[in-house]
């Protein structure tokens, strides 16, 4: 009998070893699959725990930042004799309102308000408009909010000098506006001069901070700020 014939007879007559081997392999594959599923579950669980821990740390971090910003604001208000004409609670409420419509968290805005409060001639509604304008400017120019606050604060504090600094940032004042602003300052009507400057800032940058909150990144930032 040829080798081929012998193989045919052996395969046809005795498959018990082959079947045993297949069953064993099937069990091993099944056990391996179960192990993989368990491992995936463990990995997913680890990532879930890691995400929760990370989120908790982020919340605690933001809470600390806000507490420090509020402490700084309170100190400046006290030092300036509440020159801005707004209480700390009124400022925090406004910061919260801005958080609802922009990508700036209230802790960031409160910190910026502390800086703006150091400019004693910026008061009441002018103060609020100046903060909103700083957010718009920072958004358009892609700069830090505090840097924008410093620039606008200095310009509003000394309008006749600040015009030049604002021009460097792309704010265009007509000769008539410049003349009017300087005249108002000379007459002791600084707040009216400030309003003219804020109106021009609105023309240049107005609505940018709110618009930025409308895209996917802005919406995600707003959601994060809400926590």
Segments and roles (model prediction):
Residues 15, 26, 33, 213, ...:
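Membrane-interacting alpha-helical segments
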């Amino acid at each position: 009998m040829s080798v081929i014939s012998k193989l045919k007879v052996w395969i046809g007559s005795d498959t018990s070893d082959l079947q045993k081997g297949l069953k064993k392999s099937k069990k091993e594959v099944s056990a391996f699959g179960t192990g993989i599923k368990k491992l995936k579950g463990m990995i997913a669980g680890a990532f879930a725990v890691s995400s929760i821990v990370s989120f908790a740390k982020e919340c605690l971090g933001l809470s600390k930042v806000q507490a420090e910003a509020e402490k700084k604001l309170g100190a400046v208000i006290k030092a300036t004799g509440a020159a801005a004409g707004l209480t700390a609670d009124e400022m925090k409420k406004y910061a919260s309102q801005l958080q609802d419509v922009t990508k700036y968290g209230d802790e960031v805005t409160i910190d910026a308000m502390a800086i703006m409060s150091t400019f004693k001639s910026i008061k009441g509604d002018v103060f609020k408009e100046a903060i909103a304008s700083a957010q718009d400017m920072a958004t358009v120019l892609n700069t830090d909010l505090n840097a924008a606050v410093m620039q606008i604060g200095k310009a509003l504090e000394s309008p006749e000098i600040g015009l030049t600094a604002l021009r460097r940032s792309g704010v265009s004042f007509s000769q008539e506006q410049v003349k009017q602003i300087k005249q108002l300052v000379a007459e002791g009507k600084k707040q009216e001069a400030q309003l003219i400057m804020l109106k021009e800032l609105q023309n240049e940058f107005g609505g940018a901070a709110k618009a930025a909150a409308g895209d996917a990144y802005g919406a995600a930032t707003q959601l994060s700020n809400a926590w």
